[in-house]
Amino acid sequence: MQVTEQLVDTETISGWLRRWAPLIPGGEVLDLACGSGRHARHLVSLGHPVIALDHDPEMLEKAAGAGITTSLVDLEAPGAVWPFAPGRFAGIVVTNYLHRPLLEAMIASLAPDGVLLYETFAEGNEQFGKPSNPKFLLKEGEMLAWALEHGLRVVAYEDGRVEQPKAALVQRICAVRPDFPRLAALLPTF
């Protein structure tokens, strides 16, 4: 695979990710369901080596770049197994993707001081279009509940309507493992 230099297009970066990614401590970050790699490139620009995982080889080709290791894995295939060891990642980033059977293993892959940034669609999004299948929509408070159930400390959580990049109902969370230093969670000023 040819590595090419790609600029980070800050207009396409999730505002949630842009806001909270600076909390991720030094170390490797997983961009799960990375698509074309917009967030992977942003994370590299912050100094992190990134594993960009997706099931689509064409998307991974677009995601490839300096500091990014691409990984072609279909985590929804029958018999699929989570490919990463517990405690591996300083950060895990997921946007616009939900496959509930992955959650426990994914959270276990966070380092003791790791940061989880997750943003995806919620029930009610049907009124705005796809996804509309309940399998791909979080129930009210679901993301917050599973973060707490898995021992994460919530730094920020939102559940509601967004207008950008298109109107949608979403839930999003910034949560940290228990060893994350509380003083490091510098909250942005408005």
Which sequence ranges carry the predicted segments?
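S-adenosyl-L-methionine
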Residues: 1-24
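Conserved class I S-adenosyl-L-methionine
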Residues: 27-35
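Class I SAM-dependent methyltransferase SAM/SAH-binding core
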Residues: 37, 41-79
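A short acidic, Gly/Pro-enriched loop at the edge of an enzyme's catalytic core
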Residues: 81-91
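Helix-to-beta-strand junctions that scaffold the AdoMet/dcAdoMet cofactor pocket
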Residues: 110-112
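Conserved beta-strand signature within the Rossmann-like core of class I S-adenosyl-L-methionine
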Residues: 114-124
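Short alpha-helix
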Residues: 135-151
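Core SAM-dependent methyltransferase catalytic element
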Residues: 162-190
